[in-house]
């Protein structure tokens, strides 16, 4: 509960000064923004016999505070706070044996698409922002590139058979790089994981379980 209170307090702090483009005496202004995004996951590392099935992706939302770098505010740094919900469906099946979690690759046309794993993250984006905006222009082209630090919470697995498993072997902290670009509200989002999500684990066959993703999706900004 105390952690939630701290996150809410931090979110409110970042939201101070939300009214963007409020300096009428100069060309300087802030583009403080809420965002919402949805992405499709593509597994980036080669795992023997691995198959990604169905729709695997995430949704995320958050807030970015804008700090202009020039007098026209066309370049800026952004610091944010967000929440992500991630889920992927594949033929990776976690199984509980002797009070520990093992992983196997299911080779079965019927069962391979039935294994779903989900997890949540609190993200801290830091980005460089370029835009063709002005103090009176609300529709413009933008390119935002940056780096995310993420605090991850336990994995939840719904295997093809058996009960739901809670997996504590998730990397507590991971990072990614990203690029968001587009016009007005609609923007393309590209993101690449720099770390695997599961801590140094092998499958029961001895193959390294290096689960990390490339994300392709859309991100929407709201003032």
Q: Where in the sequence are the language-model features?
A:
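Short loop/turn motifs that connect adjacent beta-strands in outer-membrane beta-barrel proteins
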Residues: 22-32, 68-75, 133-141
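Predominantly the C-terminal beta-signal and adjacent terminal strand-loop region
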Residues: 25, 43, 168-223
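Residues on the lipid-exposed face of transmembrane beta-strands in outer-membrane beta-barrel proteins
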Residues: 61-67, 81-83, 124-132, 145-151, ...
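Residues that define the transmembrane beta-barrel architecture of outer-membrane proteins
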Residues: 30-32, 53-59, 118-124, 171-177, ...
């Amino acid at each position: 509960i105390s952690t939630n209170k701290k996150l809410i307090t931090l979110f409110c702090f970042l939201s101070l000064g939300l009214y963007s483009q409020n300096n009428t005496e100069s060309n300087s202004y802030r583009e403080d923004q809420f965002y919402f995004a949805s992405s499709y996951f593509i597994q980036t590392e080669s795992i023997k016999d691995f198959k990604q099935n169905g729709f695997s992706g995430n949704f995320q939302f958050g807030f970015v505070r804008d700090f202009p770098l020039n007098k026209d505010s066309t370049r800026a740094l952004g610091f944010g706070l967000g929440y992500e919900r991630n889920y992927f469906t594949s033929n990776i099946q976690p199984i509980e044996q002797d009070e520990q979690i093992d992983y196997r690759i299911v080779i079965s046309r019927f069962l391979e698409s039935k294994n779903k794993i989900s997890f949540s993250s609190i993200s801290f984006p830091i980005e460089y922002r370029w835009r063709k905006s002005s103090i009176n222009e609300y529709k413009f082209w933008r390119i935002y590139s940056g780096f995310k630090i993420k605090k991850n919470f336990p994995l939840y697995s719904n295997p093809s058979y058996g009960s739901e498993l809670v997996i504590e072997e998730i990397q507590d902290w991971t990072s990614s790089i990203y690029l968001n670009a587009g016009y007005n509200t609609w923007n393309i989002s590209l993101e690449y994981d720099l770390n695997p999500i599961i801590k140094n684990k092998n499958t029961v066959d001895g193959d390294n379980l290096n689960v990390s993703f490339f994300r392709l999706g859309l991100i929407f900004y709201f003032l």
